[in-house]
């Protein structure tokens, strides 16, 4: 019986060209710097602290050059808690606390941040116009050494602003953490296997009209990009009624319903595209004149 399924190697479709100087280089010459994000403990952040965290992110984003992309990726994977009771510095109460939560299911939250420098043309292309299906020419802007240097300097400034806030800490990821080694998986391998485990074995990818699978995991993808689908009112945080009382508030992030409150394995990707504000202002003014 002849196999009618189309198959291709991952290498032929891979959008990444190389990882050099701890930066990810795409086949379109986009440059990406990756960070591991450490967030505050759940239910420990107040409303004022959420405002301060939001202000720090907004301040950091403003130092990035035009035509940059900020990509925040949050993993929520169901696991059973494994206590660490072999440590010598644990007290009797601490050891009892660890045993109390032994093998209890929970969502393990892992967060990454990716800062990408692209070009005006690349930032406005559609998802079906990629290096996977078309030939490409390296943009002249991305061949300019000063452009790359300024972007890397802005990334360092971005990192300092976030870390100086005192609430969130980001740590630059090195080449081995991105690509992995013989004994440990990098973020690329983890993403392609939909796992945070230290396994270097990739899963089969199945792309069909009815479903998409990675190994034994079936995927369901949702996109939220239309303003009509967004809430009428947004804020940095919200009141979590289940743990709040008349005298005290328990606050969660405004995006918690698609984050920690969504009780299944899932990944949340958030993208912020930084355009040229001066060019956009001229475009809006022209549209306003045409309307009158």
Question: What are the residue ranges of the model-derived segments?
Answer:
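Extended, folded cores of ATP/NTP-driven motor/assembly subunits in large transport
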Residues: 1-292
């Amino acid at each position: 019986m002849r196999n009618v399924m189309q198959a291709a190697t991952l290498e032929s479709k891979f959008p990444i060209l190389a990882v050099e100087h701890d930066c990810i280089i795409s086949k379109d010459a986009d440059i990406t710097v990756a960070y591991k994000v450490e967030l505050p403990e759940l239910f420990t952040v107040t409303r004022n602290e959420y405002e301060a965290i939001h202000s720090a992110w907004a301040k950091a984003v403003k130092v990035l050059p035009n035509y940059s992309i900020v990509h925040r990726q949050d993993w929520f994977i169901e696991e059973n808690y494994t206590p660490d009771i072999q440590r010598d510095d644990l007290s009797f109460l601490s050891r009892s606390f660890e045993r109390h939560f032994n093998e209890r299911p929970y969502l393990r939250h892992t967060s990454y941040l990716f800062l990408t420098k692209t070009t005006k043309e690349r930032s406005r292309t559609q998802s079906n116009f990629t290096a996977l299906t078309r030939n490409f020419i390296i943009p002249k802007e991305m061949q300019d050494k000063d452009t790359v240097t300024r972007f890397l300097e802005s990334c360092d400034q971005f990192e300092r602003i976030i870390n100086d806030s005192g609430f969130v800490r980001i740590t630059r990821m090195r080449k081995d953490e991105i690509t992995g080694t013989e004994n440990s998986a990098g973020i690329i391998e983890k993403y392609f296997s939909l796992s945070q485990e230290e396994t270097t074995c990739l899963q089969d990818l199945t792309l069909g009209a009815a479903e998409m699978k990675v190994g034994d995991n079936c995927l369901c993808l949702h996109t939220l990009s239309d303003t009509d689908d967004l809430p009428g009112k947004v804020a940095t945080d919200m009141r979590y009624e289940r743990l709040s009382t008349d005298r005290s508030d328990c606050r969660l992030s405004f995006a918690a319903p698609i984050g920690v409150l969504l009780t299944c394995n899932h990944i949340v990707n958030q993208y912020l595209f930084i355009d040229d504000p001066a060019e956009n202002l001229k475009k809006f003014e022209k549209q306003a004149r045409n309307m009158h």
